[in-house]
Regions:
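Glycine-rich Rossmann-fold phosphate-binding loop(s) that bind the pyrophosphate
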Residues: 63-67
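Terminal recognition/anchoring or ligand-binding modules at protein termini
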Residues: 521-542, 549, 553-648
Length: 648
């Protein structure tokens, strides 16, 4: 009997092993040969129809058919509000940047907690979910076919009876009336339609989902442009023109996968860092970076690599010129790729996107402005209506500037207050032009987070309607914030803050100095948050460059020049920075002349004036060899105690 049981057990074990081996073999073959095949079916673009009968008034007018605007309109409509969704650009599909701009690869906000069991077979977990997740579940993946995306957006809008859609209008002008003090209140929108006729539509609420906050600017909302808030008023992130190649079969896609140093999934590929060697025909205005490749369902790919410098997003003539030089360069870039990479050899150039990918223009000032500290410390907010985790990716601002990965956050909150602009009531701003400082905007600008903002804005219209309160009044109330968050959770958003450990840099003794330095764009941490080098030695030459950055940010406070401190110094790049030298250079930058403050007197002067704290001095281990962290702490103290600016 025992022998029989052993035989049965052995047979069962053998069968199990055979089945598992077969399953593993099948999985191996599938993973190697079929997992990355594109089995999706291409679909023609649906014809977008505008409403024929505009109403005299709506609960809310949403300006802009980028994803943020679509989400805002859907959210408001599903909450029972009558919505007019209106587009002032010449577009024939919904989706804006993702469709007309050809940006078919998403910058995603991944949750800190991801599925562990069979993770390679499961979809990643994203922050916020809600309407973004509803749309994402219907597209192909991390990249998508632009027709699919546009059609899904249109079907979602068309399915809501509370939404009227009006495309291709010639002009949108917000109508306002004077309210308290220097504040105005939205009363409606003047719309010049495609046929040239003008109508005035009444509303008490407008959601500005235009890429550049055009409605907010026209209504009188204050804003900064580009990197103006860090003392660089002429710079903004580079623009891109996405271009298309055809002939990308499953076999070609497999070759992308085999390319060393390239990452590939079913719909996206990224890498080709050495493509930067491309010699531009217009080197003052165009270069390329590594390739971001998004696959489509008709054997085409869209490539985000071209960087076009000198485009002013707020000047239509400049934008037109940017498109022209980009379209001239695109075929040349394709020729370069075909000659240098075998997998590109058989592909054909198939044109460019209809619009530029503009990363940065206006940043409005709202009831709260998202700061680098918010992102760096992964802060939550009592009125958070969405969460981000995308890298602070600051793209090039000039041909000689390669751009910066400031850091990789884990999960930070975007307050509702950042959607509520100063000076104008009845208005919300969503998307990359919301109330974000330029550095954290490098993370907060991504579309999925903008869609969370749009969903919150749409729900806020209903909340304001119920309580007969303005958006500004909502933004001051923790009770209303709790109501809004509950509404959003009830309609499918995930506003949970996940469990995670804060990054190591926050435990460093010089963290406050690091935060100040990073906020002034003096340092960066890269993708792994390990590039700060706080314990590495600082030299006089590099310290001088940090002081010049400080002076650029606060030109009225720091009118002197620290250059003279290095005038007779040899090897300023290799010599260690001493505490006396640092203090002397700080005094010179503040405007003190050599006759007033000498090298020997500078430190005592700063201490006497309480411009440097005792704790900072105690934290310096070697006063003859300052570290980066030591130097950042000195700068941080002077900026706080002399300029009155705190970055905490």
């Amino acid at each position: 009997l025992i022998s029989r049981k052993l035989k049965i057990t052995a047979i069962i074990a053998s069968v199990f092993i055979v089945l598992m081996s077969a399953a593993y073999g099948a999985f191996y073959i599938w993973n190697k040969n079929y997992k990355f095949n594109n089995n999706y079916v291409w679909q023609p673009l649906e014809d977008v129809q505008s409403t024929l009968n505009l109403k005299d008034s709506y609960n809310v007018i949403v300006a802009g058919t980028d994803p943020e605007g679509i989400t805002a309109a859907l959210s408001a409509a599903r909450n029972g509000m009558r919505v007019l969704l209106v587009e002032a650009r010449d577009r024939n599909m919904l989706g804006g940047l993702l469709t007309e701009g050809g940006l078919n690869t998403l910058d995603l906000n991944y949750s800190p907690e991801q599925p562990q069991l069979l993770s390679s077979l499961r979809q990643p977990d994203f922050l916020n979910k809600g309407i973004f997740q509803e749309w994402f579940d219907q597209i192909e993946g991390s990249s998508f076919d632009t027709n699919t995306a546009a059609n899904i957006f249109y079907r979602m809008v068309r399915s809501e009876p509370n939404i009227d859609l009006l495309m291709n209008v010639k002009e949108l002008v917000p109508l306002t009336e004077q309210s308290t003090g220097d504040y105005t209140t939205i009363t409606g929108m003047s719309i010049t339609k495609e046929d040239g006729t003008t109508v005035q539509i009444s509303t008490r609420s407008i959601i500005d989902a235009t890429q550049d906050a055009d409605i907010a600017a026209a209504a009188g909302v204050p804003y900064s442009i580009g990197r103006q808030d860090i003392g660089d008023g002429k710079s903004k992130m580079v623009s891109t023109l996405v271009f298309k190649l055809s002939g990308v079969t499953d076999e070609v896609w497999q070759k992308f996968r085999e390319r060393e140093g390239t990452g590939v999934d079913k719909m996206s590929a990224w890498g080709y860092g050495d493509a930067r060697k491309y010699e531009s025909s217009n080197p003052q205005h165009i270069k390329i970076r590594s390739l971001n490749i998004g696959r489509q369902n008709d054997d085409t790919i869209l490539i985000n690599t071209m960087q076009i410098f000198g485009v002013d997003p707020l000047d239509p003539i400049s934008v037109k010129k940017g498109l022209e030089i980009g379209r001239k360069e695109a075929p040349l870039i394709v020729d370069f790729l075909k000659k240098n990479y075998d997998e590109f050899a058989g592909l054909k150039y198939a044109g460019t996107a209809d619009e530029l990918y503009v990363r940065e223009s206006r940043h409005i000032y709202g009831e709260y402005r998202l700061t680098l500290a918010d992102v760096m410390e992964n802060r939550d907010h009592w009125d958070a209506i969405g969460y981000g985790s995308y890298d602070i990716d600051i793209q090039s601002t000039s041909v000689g500037n390669p751009g910066t990965i400031m850091l990789s956050p884990i999960q930070y909150g975007v307050p509702f207050r950042s959607l509520v602009p100063l000076k104008v009531d009845g208005l919300l701003v969503v998307g990359r032009a919301a109330s974000f400082d330029t550095i954290p905007h490098g993370s907060a600008r991504v579309v999925p987070l903008g869609m969370a903002e749009g969903e919150a804005a749409g729900a806020a219209v209903k909340l304001a309607y119920i309580h007969k309160e303005s958006f500004r009044e909502l933004s001051t109330s923790e009770e209303r914030a709790s109501e809004l968050r509950k509404m959003l959770e009830n309609q499918g958003m995930d506003l949970k803050v996940h469990r995670f450990e804060q990054p190591d840099y926050m435990e460093h003794k010089d963290y406050k100095g690091l935060l100040a330095a990073a906020s002034m764009y003096m340092t960066s941490g890269n993708y792994n948050n390990d590039g700060w080098e706080l314990d590495k030695g600082m030299n006089p030459e590099r310290f001088l460059s940090k002081l010049k950055r400080m002076q650029a940010m606060f030109p009225e406070a720091y009118t002197g020049s620290a250059d003279q401190a290095l005038a007779n110094m040899e090897n300023a790049v290799t010599l260690p920075l001493t505490l006396d030298q640092a203090a002397y250079m700080l005094c010179l930058a503040m405007g003190s002349s050599e006759t007033e403050t000498s090298l020997e007197q500078a430190l005592a002067h700063l201490q006497t004036q309480n411009f440097i704290s005792a704790d900072t001095l105690v934290g310096i281990a070697d006063k003859n060899n300052l570290t980066n962290g030591d130097a950042f702490m000195l700068i941080r103290d002077v900026v706080e105690y002399y300029s009155g600016v705190v970055f905490d």
